[in-house]
């Protein structure tokens, strides 16, 4: 299987990603990638630098975004959930930019789009269900206002609701919706999400897409991301470097673009589509 990284953040993901688009492209080429998707938080400001770098290095650029989404545009203070969106072609790139523009116009602080927005401008786009901060994932494991399912009945109800959401997405985007599984085996919630998505894929036929949610190009860059987190709202009140490292220092070998990309454990033995599930990439 030829792996392509489809969920990638550069320094344009403010106070979260580290490394220039060129550094990420250089690292991708070192690892043998033929293409790379950059999905900044809520913006496409790296697109020009990314395209220029990818062309220089000789890999295919895939333009995307990790969007902030909300159920409606009525309350700008409501909780935001993540959704991974990729442009497949020129129409998709145009619609991606339309979505980003609208998301900045209709919200303050965090540019936010609704499901209706994504559906309206969905032509040429591929949608991944998102990371552990997505609406579907939070339904499954709790977080962002969702209670952690404790009983078997609660867990089953959450699973059924996620199944209904996934099938709606699959119907709207007609073969261009994927369940996103990620390779963080040390994170319990991610293991639970992956297992649920693998089962859901088996039951519904909705394909899986394995991603790495990369935030810096090399393992040794982990400490810089810790510093970036400490500078943001999530670092408020953490006075020492030791405290920042304790909270944010995830295992480096599973939180950076890897020397060896092993996605075989992300889906509990269930098959991900060739080239991470996205034909044409």
Enumerate the predicted regions with their spans.
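Phosphodiester-processing cores and adjacent nucleic acid-binding clamps
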Residues: 1-263, 274, 278-281
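Short, small-residue-biased leader/transition segments that mark boundaries at the very start
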Residues: 266-272
């Amino acid at each position: 299987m030829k792996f392509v990284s489809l969920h990638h953040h550069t320094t344009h993901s403010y106070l979260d990603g580290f490394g220039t688009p060129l550094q990420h492209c250089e690292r991708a080429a070192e690892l043998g990638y033929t293409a790379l998707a950059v999905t900044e938080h809520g913006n496409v400001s790296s697109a020009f630098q990314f395209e220029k770098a990818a062309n220089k290095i000789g890999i295919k650029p895939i333009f995307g975004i990790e969007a902030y989404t909300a159920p409606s545009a009525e309350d700008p203070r409501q909780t935001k959930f993540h959704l991974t969106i990729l442009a497949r072609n020129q129409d998709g790139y145009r619609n991606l930019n339309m979505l980003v523009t609208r998301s900045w116009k209709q919200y303050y602080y965090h540019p936010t789009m609704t499901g209706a927005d994504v559906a309206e401008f969905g032509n040429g786009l591929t949608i991944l269900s998102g990371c552990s901060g997505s609406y579907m994932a939070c339904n499954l494991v709790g977080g962002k206002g969702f209670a952690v399912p404790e009983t078997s009945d609660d867990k089953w109800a959450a699973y059924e609701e996620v199944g209904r959401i996934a099938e709606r997405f699959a119907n709207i985007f007609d073969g261009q919706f994927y369940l996103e599984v990620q390779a963080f085996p040390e994170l319990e919630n991610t293991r639970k999400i992956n297992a649920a998505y693998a089962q859901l894929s088996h039951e519904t036929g909705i394909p899986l897409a394995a991603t790495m949610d990369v935030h810096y190009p090399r393992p040794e860059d982990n400490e810089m991301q810790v510093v970036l987190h400490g500078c943001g709202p999530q670092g408020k009140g953490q006075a020492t470097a030791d405290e920042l490292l304790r909270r944010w220092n995830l295992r480096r070998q599973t939180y950076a673009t890897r020397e060896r990309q092993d996605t075989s454990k992300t889906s509990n033995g269930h098959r991900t589509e060739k080239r991470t599930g996205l034909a044409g990439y």
